[in-house]
From Swiss-Prot:
Pfam families, sorted: C2, PLA2_B
Domain PLA2c: 140-740
Protein name listed in UniProt: Cytosolic phospholipase A2
The protein's assembly and partners: Interacts with KAT5.
Keywords: Calcium, Cytoplasm, Fatty acid biosynthesis, Fatty acid metabolism, Glycerol metabolism, Golgi apparatus, Hydrolase, Isopeptide bond, Leukotriene biosynthesis, Lipid biosynthesis, Lipid degradation, Lipid metabolism, Lipid-binding, Membrane, Metal-binding, Nucleus, Phospholipid degradation, Phospholipid metabolism, Phosphoprotein, Prostaglandin biosynthesis, Prostaglandin metabolism, Ubl conjugation
Amino acid sequence: MSFIDPYQHIIVEHHYSHKFTVVVLRATKVTKGTFGDMLDTPDPYVELFISSTPDSRKRTRHFNNDINPVWNETFEFILDPNQENILEITLMDANYVMDETLGTTTFPISSMKVGEKKQVPFIFNQVTEMILEMSLEVCSSPDLRFSMALCDQEKAFRQQRKENIKENMKKLLGPKNSEGLHSTRDVPVVAILGSGGGFRAMVGFSGVMKALYESGILDCATYIAGLSGSTWYMSTLYSHPDFPEKGPEEINKELMKNVSHNPLLLLTPQKIKRYVESLWRKKSSGQPVTFTDIFGMLIGETLIHNRMNTTLSSLKEKVNTGQCPLPLFTCLHVKPDVSELMFADWVEFSPFEIGMAKYGTFMAPDLFGSKFFMGTVVKKYEENPLHFLMGVWGSAFSILFNRVLGVSGSQSKGSTMEEELENITAKHIVSNDSSDSDDESQGPKGTEHEEAEREYQNDNQASWVQRMLMALVSDSALFNTREGRAGKVHNFMLGLNLNTSYPMSPLRDFTMQESLDEDELDAAVADPDEFEQIYEPLDVKSKKIHVVDSGLTFNLPYPLILRPQRGVDLIISFDFSARPSDSSPPFKELLLAEKWAKMNKLPFPKIDPYVFDREGLKECYVFKPKNPDVEKDCPTIIHFVLANINFRKYKAPGVPRETNEEKEIADFDIFDDPESPFSTFNFQYPNQAFKRLHDLMYFNTLNNIDVIKNAIVESIEYRRQNPSRCSVSLSSVEARRFFNKEFLSKPTA
């Protein structure tokens, strides 16, 4: 049964760009002047330049010794119609050393009307005539999707997944507990969340996923969302050719073998040369390269070394029939001069789309990193491999890469890696350099002759590769500074008009109109300035943006799951975040997520941190809406923490440990162990350490399966009592109309 999606009727404001097409047809009587023609016959080509647009400089091929060349070459420019756009046309003569300018003229594009197409002659040096054919049209089909709604692919996935989940829940819960599942509308949306925490999070999440897979809970989940270390496990699992036919158990054995090696083995001269040459190809194509690219390669070589060409788009085959939960990954967009706790835009990644819900702006995964202007691709690159994204999602570790490898002795005494990571701010990792400019707008007119250009490029490549090799194998500034370590990509929102950002819950803003406790919002969880600037927009004039590890703001990927469009009923979160000790309260990240949700007017159950004082440390805690009749959209949260409690006594739920060996293997601390085998920055896990952490989280999850099942049963009943959940109602339509009127009546900047 289909229903109306109210979010698809909310208009995300954007201006259309113009596409200006130039066909360089021909020229006659090309001359270098009387004296010049006596010495040499021209080798002409044409260069086109529009300073107001990215990818602004284009050129034709050149013809040797031809004074009447016929090029018939077509070029396209994407223009902002609100700017003054001038086409600069330069006739060039190709030479071996340096090309010569034969003449330059300009054409005001504003003199053309939309829909007009005409041929225009241009005269150079009173003799040469060049004919260009030009046309101007509106780009009515941008490459970005502007919408508050989920994409059609995700909607189709959800429908298919619900059909599967309906049968899976009946099997999991039995006839009595699943009698409320009459149709797919009764199926609750269950999401699984994994936190950051380096390899500790990855290994712990591997045990969790094994338990969820074997217990049948995974078959009942619609989403699985990860951050930093958890995304590495998700990437490993979903990119594996045998998943889901082969379960996590076999894949986890491969993972244990892969992480048992010293990461320094990845830095052999032969491997480094291969990494750097690959990065050179990326850099020379016009894409930014940072240390995060290198870190992504190292993570990829460790975890998915036999599938380094895998892309995010290719993971669609794992979910195209709803056979697996949809994986969601995340990073942050940050500003160079603002703490990420104050300002950060959450970027979400799925096999279907990448984008920022805050701006209602999304793109196909293969376009991430391409050069955009006003929502249209002006230069497309190959899709970034999955390992590059893995480096971005966990880029906090590239920031302190010297600590990861243990190659620097410069760290301050008494400083733990966790403490050092907590002190990182955006200004430490984002270089405010001048490389934001485009090469084509900076370079002089003309280029060297092709042979000279190749020679120059080869020399430049050799020099760049040599510098990178020296930086990686020596104790250089690259290891000892943090600036420039953040991931960097072309700004896909360049040139858009952002008069305002959009609320994460647009319909809720106007239908609920509930009063928020200002004292609650002002209370600091980790920092007095946390989330102070989260309503501010991205800089649409910056040609590149910095993307970093989401754990630098808070370490749980709740923003992906709390989007009201996803209508999640039950969230099962697993927090592997570092704590001062095993006995420390485990709610810091969850409290930050709660505050973020309230500031964005998103429903979130009240997190009572004093439950720790009353009940002590437990394997999991359940948080429900206090007034379910009023908080109809509020999810239930089952929050698992990293704690070794019952695992010390039981080798399986209800099965006591008996032998000394069984007791000894389970007698360990996570954060109080002085040798820190589970440190956030430990990137080598011996088999015993892997098995301990993996088996601990496997046990903790299975030990609380009944808690999860009971929550699913309650969610089914909750759905049955609230059939209008996430579907349209009269109040929603009115809210949508009010929303459009409120936000679209504002004057443009």
